[in-house]
Amino acid sequence: MDSLHVLRSFLLLFIVFNHLPRTTTSMSEPKVITIDVNQAQKLLDSGYTFLDVRTVEEFKKGHVDSENVFNVPYWLYTPQGQEINPNFLKHVSSLCNQTDHLILGCKSGVRSLHATKFLVSSGFKTVRNMDGGYIAWVNKRFPVKVEHKELKYDEL
């Protein structure tokens, strides 16, 4: 009877442990380094490239002003809703090498976090996410640039 009790206990433990949710290990999740805007500004001054992953419209209204700044939207707004830009990696790869030093930013740091994970998992080596995004950059009164559009006569 004693061995039957041990067998039942073992079987119960096996069933319980086999059905517990499994946590993902760090090997499956790319390691993302997030930096604040003070660190971002220092790295940009040292030669890092800034990749703004907001929409083109957001970018034109104002963006980080630095020597190497590119706009490649990570999310697109389509009639079906918000979708990941299917050409994101192709566009980034046409502008940057996988060994380039990149800082990614968006409005608040959420889109850029996802984009940073994507680039790291795609083989980019030195990628940083800017915490707080453009909002934090502006709040620190760091340099910004606004893309001026040509006004048409009827817009004057």
Curated annotation (Swiss-Prot):
The active site is at residue 106. InterPro entries: Rhodanese-like_dom (IPR001763), Rhodanese-like_dom_sf (IPR036873), STR17/STR18/HARC1-like (IPR044684). It holds the Pfam family Rhodanese. Residues 44-146 form the Rhodanese domain. GO terms for molecular function: catalytic activity. Coiled coil: none annotated. This is Rhodanese-like domain-containing protein 17. It comes from Arabidopsis thaliana.
